[in-house]
Amino acid sequence: MSTPRNPLLAGHWFTNELALIVAIGCVVLFTLAVDSNRAYYNRRDESVQEISRQVAMLGIFALGAAVVIISGGIDLSLGSTIATCGVACAAIVLALTPQSYAPSMWQSTGICIAAIGGSIVTGLMIGTLHTWLITSIKLPPFVATLATLVGLRSLARAFCDYVNVKVTGTGGSKININNPIFVFIRDNVWVSVVVLIAMVLVTWFVLSKTVLGRHIYALGGNEQAARLSGIRTENVKWAAYCFSSFTASIAAIFYLANSSVADPVTQARGHELNAIAAAVVGGCALQGGIGTVPGTLLGVIFLRVVVDGVSKMIKSQAETYEGLIVGAVVVAAVTLTQAKQLLSSGRQMFAGFRGSAAILALTLFSGLVALVTLGHWNALIISIVILIVLSGIKLSERQPSRV
């Protein structure tokens, strides 16, 4: 059996982590220099709390995404799983909360514990469903989780309407909750941060110090070789996908607490891509077998710092550009990780007519992004610089290498 590509165990993770730390520092310094409102200075505590909240919420289920990617799979349903688990959690709160009087703190605590348990059980059931579709029905992970990405939200919406009719007598696609424990979770950011730290430590320990962790890396590195070596790959996949859905069920609790409403239509929509992006930026290879927990955590921090920095620099409708930012960061991260392989193999990035067309497309696309964010003069300058740089790369590729 080939040796599992586990950079954490091999001790080759430092460079990637160091690069991310430097990148995070550069983004923060650039934001400090460019932001005219000086938000990091004038509203320091508020900025730290908001970034911490967003990092904790994304980081919790990004760990699940990373474990699945390391095992050689993919989970596209994390956002829908969060929404579904949030609905299950809110439905239990609504069903158990007395309508005729305000429950005591002890009653509210018991209701909250039951609701959290319901969210976790729902997540584990979804993870088990994914494993069955992948191992028994033999669906590719992409297809299996894409199906639940779409189907779970519709199911959660229908369940919302059913619960509202049964409990309140009126239908609705949202479930509003009023529980003091969830209010406490919302108002105390440290709760989500502590949960994230605990999950980071547990995930790191499992991946780096246990047999299951070695099997996850082996499965992602070469599934056929792992199976021939005696590893029960179906069980390892079940552990990976259940852990992914478990992290989503934990994240759902904080999503629900932050908004006090379970909304399966919009809650965590598209956030599964943010989790995958954070894992990839943190060093996880989409082909499997490579990835670290520290890298994933730093990928989450980097992604959220970049998004927050853009929101500070672009004063209006900054959320419009979040998807663009995430996509650009992922492409840049994957390109940088593949750069060494491209150089060593002698392959050309911009070969022939297709390369010239790609240079033109990249220049126009970059100019368009700069136009809508920075203005027409900056867009013109950026377009010219990118055109010159990419054309220089193409010309250098055409030069014969000297031995």
Residue ranges with predicted function:
Residues 19-33, 65, 120-123, 149, ...:
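Hydrophobic core segments of alpha-helical transmembrane domains in multi-pass membrane transport
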Residues 67, 91, 96, 124-137, ...:
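Membrane-interface helix caps of multi-pass small-molecule transporters
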Residues 111-119, 125-126, 130, 186-261, ...:
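Helix-loop-helix "hairpin" substructures at the membrane interface of multi-pass membrane proteins
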Residues 127, 242, 248, 259, ...:
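Transmembrane alpha-helical segments in multi-pass inner-membrane proteins
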Residues 30-34, 44-101, 132-139, 225, ...:
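Single transmembrane alpha-helix segments in multi-pass membrane proteins
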Residues 99-149, 298-303:
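Alpha-helical transmembrane segments within multi-pass membrane transporters and channels
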Residues 141-209, 238, 259-268, 313-322, ...:
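Transmembrane helix-bundle core of multi-pass membrane transporters
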Residues 2-60, 97-114, 371-402:
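Membrane-interfacial amphipathic/re-entrant helices at transmembrane-helix boundaries
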